């Protein structure tokens, strides 16, 4: 099993998705680092998690409508944790390419924003063709599986992973018309295309829903979707079928909702299972006992010690 440094790290004094956070865990010997790729208004590829800048930078507005110059003028994360810039994909690829092959962590590139697949593929293609990076250095993941197909049109040899476990905004809006007015308060990342219940416990989510939405069809539809998500209802044979069809190497799933039985089924299909994002001792040990192949964590050194990894 491997640990993947989620957005670099969340150590005190470090901001996620920054070159400094990547360098920190690289120096600690991490074997893989995950980061998020978006597309800005100028067609460049900033490394930012949230679609809206407000919670993850000193800026405001959508990443997709922001210029590269604006993104370069603001700080990533909280300046009190360090005055970090928002990096761009080329800078990250340069950082990894500068590391000796034997010590180079695998880049887990999550294609976060719409339209990221082709431009990311073109940039990665240059590094592959120049021999500065190789296919074993890169794993591309996304909740938007069309972006995985898109990057494969440029780099067909890249390994891909299907992300799942989140509530998909578009399908939920279609199933529960009118429910979208509650998304921002009901879900984590409620303004985005892929959302998570606020709490791992169904009862807490139902209590929150009751405080927001009157009983009726909308209430029932939202409650049903939360129940489906938390019960692992998204982890189906169809998901594994799609992973096989796309020749994916893994499915990356929300640890709160995955079962040991599904992990075993994925393994029977020849697929690895990676879980996001685990930081507590008990949950790390439970995931390891389940037999998963990798865990995304915000605290690499602490998680490594808990699991007794070399």
Where in this protein do the model-derived segments appear?
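Phosphate-group recognition and catalysis centered on beta-loop-alpha active-site segments
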Residues: 1-310
């Amino acid at each position: 099993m491997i640990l993947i440094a989620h957005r670099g790290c969340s150590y005190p004094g470090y901001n996620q998705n920054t070159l400094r956070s990547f360098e920190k865990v690289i120096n600690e010997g991490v074997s893989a680092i995950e980061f998020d790729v978006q597309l800005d208004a100028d067609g460049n590829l900033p490394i930012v998690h949230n679609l809206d800048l407000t919670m993850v930078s000193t800026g405001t507005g959508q990443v997709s409508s922001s210029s590269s110059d604006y993104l370069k003028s603001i700080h990533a994360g909280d300046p009190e944790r360090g005055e970090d810039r928002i990096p761009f994909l080329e800078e990250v690829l340069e950082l990894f390419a500068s590391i000796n092959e034997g010590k180079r962590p695998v880049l887990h590139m999550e294609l976060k924003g719409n339209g990221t697949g082709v431009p990311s593929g073109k940039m990665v293609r240059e590094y592959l063709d120049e021999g500065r990076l190789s296919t074993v250095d890169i794993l591309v993941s996304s909740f938007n599986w069309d972006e995985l197909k898109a990057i494969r049109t440029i780099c067909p040899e890249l390994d891909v992973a299907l992300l799942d476990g989140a509530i998909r905004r578009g399908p939920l809006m279609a199933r529960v018309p009118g429910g979208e007015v509650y998304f921002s308060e009901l879900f984590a990342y409620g303004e985005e295309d892929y959302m998570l219940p606020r709490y791992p416990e169904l009862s807490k989510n139902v209590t929150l829903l009751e405080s927001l939405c009157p009983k009726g069809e909308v209430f029932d539809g939202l409650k049903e979707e939360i129940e489906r998500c938390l019960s692992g209802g998204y982890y189906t044979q169809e998901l594994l079928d799609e992973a096989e069809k796309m020749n994916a190497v893994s499915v990356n799933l929300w640890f709160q909702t995955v079962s040991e039985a599904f992990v075993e089924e994925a393994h029977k299909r020849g697929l690895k299972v990676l879980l996001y994002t685990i930081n507590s001792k008990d949950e790390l040990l439970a995931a390891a006992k389940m037999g998963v192949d990798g865990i995304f964590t915000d605290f690499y050194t602490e998680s490594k010690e808990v699991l007794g990894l070399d």
